[in-house]
From Swiss-Prot:
It comes from Prosthecochloris aestuarii (strain DSM 271 / SK 413). Its cofactor is pyruvate. This is Aspartate 1-decarboxylase. GO terms for molecular function: aspartate 1-decarboxylase activity. Heterooctamer of four alpha and four beta subunits. GO terms for cellular component: cytosol. It holds the Pfam family Asp_decarbox. The modification Pyruvic acid (Ser) is found at residue 25. Pathway: Cofactor biosynthesis; (R)-pantothenate biosynthesis; beta-alanine from L-aspartate: step 1/1. Keywords: Autocatalytic cleavage, Cytoplasm, Decarboxylase, Lyase, Pantothenate biosynthesis, Pyruvate, Schiff base, Zymogen. One of its GO terms (biological process) is alanine biosynthetic process. The gene is panD.
Length: 129
């Protein structure tokens, strides 16, 4: 049996912009992607902390250091610039391996600077801005 588990999360990211005319997706600073163990084209579930809305899309790699979190296409209607969102990826893992699996959590500040990261159940690693 395979279980669908949280793989990684960017916690409390701030939406920086939106582009309704784009084909779809979420553009994320490539440094944040690397720190969060996320990949371009990976499916994400996003939760808007301001209004509770949940939506799915896929990742586009943004410019390193830009701190951009841009919603594109229809997703741009789900959160406005300034809204706080949680971005999550998931993986299918064999039940036996799932017992020991630990997702990566990246915490960012309100300018989307990485503050700290950790595997669930382990100590935080503080990160320089």
């Amino acid at each position: 049996m395979r279980l669908h588990l949280l793989k990684s999360k960017i916690h409390n990211a701030i939406v920086t912009s939106g582009d309704l005319e784009y084909e779809g997706s979420i553009t994320i600073d490539s440094q944040l992607l690397e720190l969060a163990d996320m990949l371009p084209n990976e499916k994400v579930l996003c939760v808007n902390n301001n209004n509770g809305e949940r939506f799915e899309t896929y990742i586009i790699k943004g410019k390193a250091g830009s701190r951009e979190i841009q919603l594109n296409g229809a997703a741009a209607r789900c959160a406005l610039p300034g809204d706080e969102i949680i971005i999550m990826t998931f993986a299918e893992i064999e039940a036996e391996k799932a017992k020991d699996f630990k997702p990566m959590i990246l915490i960012v500040d309100h300018q989307n600077n990485p503050k700290r990261r950790h595997l669930v159940g382990e100590e935080d690693t503080p990160l320089p801005h």
